[in-house]
Amino acid sequence: SPFKNLNEINFLIDRLNEEGNYIESSKIINQLYPFKAKKLKNGKSINDFKPININDEIEKLNEYQIILINDYHFFETSRYSTLFFLHHLKELGFLNLLTEGISPKTENKALKIKEIDGYYLKQPTYGLLIDYAVKNNINIFGYDYYYDCENKSLNNQKCRDSMQAVNIKSIVEKNPNSKFIVFGGHGHTFYNYEDIKPMGQYLKDFLPNTKIVSLNQLYYIDSFGEQESSLELLNDKLKLNTP
């Protein structure tokens, strides 16, 4: 039977990734989350902007101690762009990568190679990002106690974002002279996000004297508003069925 909702499709994407069938997974992802030149409030779109010298922009980030970068979990391009930032930012002393989906094994300490494990590492581009960091002597930290919130039956979103910020704060305070890149999904890295207080805002509240910047690299990736039409496209044109 045809897919009835997006959860069924996301479940299939997860299964394909677990089986190593990344080509089929990517085909579905690229149909479900198409790129679109989204309009801004002033009526402009991405097509109206002129190219910039990215090296000049990266130099401006040198004044910050913490850079928050968000990931679009089902859109692999966001990992490539983050890898690009990582490559340049390490030259400015950002030698600590804190990643979502990886739980810390030892409190406040960088993970050893054999300790790096997590759900998103099943996706090749996420693994590529972590592999690059390890090979370039960038410390990997986990900060995500996702399942702790589920097991305690708390408000999962509020619990998770606040706990992420608590763990990041602890890592930063133990390494006060270091610089950090925090890689988190979707709106977790924002300062405000609809009616949810995200990790980025908690972190700013917890570290008021620390210079923090949030880079939203996903603004022009078409998001949830277009997913229902994408669902129809998947069912009608690709003839996809549930397992």
List the model feature ranges, each with a label:
Residues 1-243:
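Compositional signal for N-terminal targeting/processing segments
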